[in-house]
Amino acid sequence: MRCAFASVLLVAALAVAGCAQGGTSDTDSAAKFSGAEKQIATTVEDLQTAAKDKNGAKICASLITIQLQQSVAKQSAGKGCSSAVDKAIKQTDPVDYIVKDVKITGDSATATVQSKSDKDVVATEQWTLQKQAGRWKISSTPA
């Protein structure tokens, strides 16, 4: 199933971009937002911190949607979401995230996220988030 495999790659990419060995910036992009927009930006920053701390369990349990977590777990050859994310974190280079914009529609949101690697490669992407159990969680990024 290509979609399910893409989900594993997505979470791996999230963990990777979340800085496998720690990001290069101390930028607090959530500081420029307020309310729900700040919560969304904080979720992105929390992903970066969890990856820096090599905490795949936190990424899977707290920062991605239940659907994405289940999809990754299903595709991880029985090892679970946390193991798949931990493995991805170990195999990647650091990247920093900066949330540039947030648009909210009900319990769905789109965040414009800029990522920058140690090699100064910059990409700007649209991430989607869903509000689940009172917290904004990442549901997808461009694969």
Report each predicted region and the residues it spans.
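Sec-dependent bacterial lipoprotein signal peptides
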Residues: 1-18
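Bacterial lipoprotein signal-peptidase II cleavage site
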Residues: 15-30
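Sequence contexts marking disulfide-bonded cysteines in secreted/extracellular proteins
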Residues: 20, 59-63, 80-84
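Short, aromatic-enriched amphipathic alpha-helices that serve as compact interaction elements
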Residues: 34-54
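Hydrophobic pocket/interface hotspot
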Residues: 47, 59, 129
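Short, well-ordered alpha-helical segments enriched in acidic and aromatic residues
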Residues: 53-71
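Surface-exposed, charged secondary-structure patches
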Residues: 78-124, 143
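Short beta-strand edge/turn micro-motifs at domain boundaries
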Residues: 122-143
